[in-house]
Amino acid sequence: MTMLKINDLCVNYGMLEAVKNVSMELPEGKVISLLGANGSGKSTILKTISGLKDSRQGEIFFGDTKINGMEIDKIVDLGISLIPEGRRLFPYMSVLQNLNLGAYLQSSKAEIDKVRAEVYEHFPMLKKRANVRSSKLSGGEQELLSVARGLMSRPRMLLMDEPCQGLSPIMVKEIRKTIRALNERGLTILLVEHNVSIALGVADHVYILRNGSIVFEGSPSELSTEEFTKKIYLAG
């Protein structure tokens, strides 16, 4: 079953075409990696799906619902959660306070407490450090907090923008483990990456974006790491 479908998507920044006639289908319950160099349009696609950026052309469907032009909170309410690049935490707020900001769609304190308890099952370290300022966490811990905050809206799909950027090999391994664990619990994940080994290590399906256009779609097993890298950076 297809969870998200993109048809002929075009997105501009002024006169610059950032995304050019992109079509994608994301099956439910899978991890899909969107690979590309910096500036290839990967993050723009995530922003457009999540309502942060308007499209010039094309359609985006979440299930049977067209979400182009929909308000951000309505997109979140449908079940889409964006984990932005750079974490975007509030440094002077505690872990607990940052988490609660992700629960603004929940109707009561009891509901927030219930969802937070579910999230803590995935991230017991965050429960132990609930009253610590997020600025006191390591980069990897901050990334885990960013993911945890995204889960507070009880999404069906996670959009993850470069979650391993700037992290140590140990924390990269932890993030990859987290992605797989969340997927095994039923979450569909669209992972944006420029690092081939990270993307292929968790993906069920891969798209490669170059200069705003899809140049490859297929299984991680279809090409070697070297061949994937060439497709990202070299035309032809």
Regions found by a protein language model. Give the residues of each.
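ABC ATPase C-loop
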Residues: G150-L151
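Conserved ABC ATPase signature
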Residues: R133-L137, E141
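The feature captures the beta-strand-to-loop junction immediately N-terminal to the Walker
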Residues: L35-A37
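Helix-to-loop junction immediately C-terminal to a conserved catalytic motif
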Residues: S50
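ABC-type ATPase nucleotide-binding domains, specifically the catalytic core motifs of the NBD
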Residues: G14, I32, M70, V95-K114, ...
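Catalytic Walker B motif of ABC-type/P-loop ATPase nucleotide-binding domains
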Residues: L158-E162
